[in-house]
């Protein structure tokens, strides 16, 4: 075997293996969605980014979850260009790319059409902070970005969806590092986090909070918003400088 052949084989192996960690990570994260009851059929997708490599891995479009493997995950750059993969990436890839490119502190994104969160999105309503489960995770209502106008819809739709989210956060004075979830009016939820696993966690939390808020309004349609002192207490005991929740 010639040295040239060995060098070529080593190069190919390195090219294949350098993305393996995010392909494995995003495969495992995607497989959590049906287990958690957050997706039906091929709805939904998870991506995981590697900032040093300047790419993210994402679920291929329209492939059933029981047919997914780490090797089928598609590698994409932050401009939405496919770098490596035999399958087409998720139809929502450009939305993920826009968020990664503009929000540098996130490394995982989830998009689902989970039932209760999507119902709030279709109703074009923020999810009010009614209870401490909500306050354990964020101090504001879950925001709902307004529906997109016709110009955005008929343009580069998925790309513009990303900017609809970013613009709403800027206009509302929200910090994406604190509020790691959003509803897109008439559409569905997106969540994110420092890892793909955290983004999946946030997606599950959002669905639970959405269901609780819906049921709260059925029981008492004049239910008051959680008072600020309880919001502060519950959020800071988990996330504040003197947090004492958990074992660390």
Model segments located where?
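N-terminal amphipathic/basic-hydrophobic helices that include classical n-h-c signal peptides
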Residues: 1-15
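Glycine-rich flexible loops
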Residues: 16-248
């Amino acid at each position: 075997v010639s040295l040239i052949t060995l060098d070529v084989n080593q190069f190919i192996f390195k090219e294949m293996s350098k993305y393996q960690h995010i392909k494995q990570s995003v495969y495992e994260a995607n497989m959590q969605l049906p287990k958690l009851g957050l997706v039906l059929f091929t709805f939904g997708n998870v991506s995981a980014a590697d900032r040093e490599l300047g790419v993210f891995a994402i679920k291929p479009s329209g492939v059933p979850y029981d047919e997914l493997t780490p090797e089928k995950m598609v590698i994409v750059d932050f401009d939405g260009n496919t770098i490596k993969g035999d399958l087409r990436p998720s139809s929502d890839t450009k939305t993920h790319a826009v968020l990664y490119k503009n929000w540098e502190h996130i490394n995982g994104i989830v998009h689902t059409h989970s039932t209760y969160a999507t119902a709030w999105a279709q109703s074009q309503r923020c999810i009010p902070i009614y209870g401490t489960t909500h306050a354990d995770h964020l101090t504001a209502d879950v925001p709902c970005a307004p529906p997109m106008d016709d110009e955005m819809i008929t343009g580069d739709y998925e790309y513009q969806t990303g900017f609809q989210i970013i613009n709403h956060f800027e206009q509302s004075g929200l910090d994406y590092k604190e509020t790691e979830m959003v509803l897109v009016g008439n559409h569905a939820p997106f969540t994110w986090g420092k890892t793909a696993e955290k983004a999946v966690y946030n997606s599950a939390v959002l669905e639970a909070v959405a269901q609780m808020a819906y049921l709260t309004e059925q029981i008492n349609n004049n239910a008051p918003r959680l008072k600020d002192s309880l919001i502060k207490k519950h959020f800071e005991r988990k996330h504040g400088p003197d947090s004492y929740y958990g074992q660390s």
